[in-house]
Amino acid sequence: MSDNTENKALRTVEGRVVSNKMDKTVTVLVERQVKHALYGKYIKRSTKLHAHDADNACKEGDVVRVTEIAPMSKTKNWRVVEVITRAAE
């Protein structure tokens, strides 16, 4: 049996922390732009992700980079890799 555990490039996205009320978990809002199929106008689309924040270091308004991981719970399968920009206090 061959070993198929190659180093795959994990998905990483950047987003803004909109909630840090849970213990060791933050909600990250990820915005992207998609082109409308018929009219060609670029439209903003957003997704909310639950990400693991082991140190409870993230505050609301921080811009963070998150990466995909194996599921930790029903809704949490992302992990905070780094805080890019801190929110103004």
Swiss-Prot record:
The keyword Ribosomal protein applies. Part of the 30S ribosomal subunit. It comes from the Bacteria. The gene is rpsQ. It holds the Pfam family Ribosomal_S17. This is Small ribosomal subunit protein uS17. GO terms for molecular function: rRNA binding; structural constituent of ribosome. GO terms for biological process: translation. Keywords: Ribonucleoprotein, Ribosomal protein, RNA-binding, rRNA-binding. GO terms for cellular component: cytosolic small ribosomal subunit. CDD domains: Ribosomal_uS17.
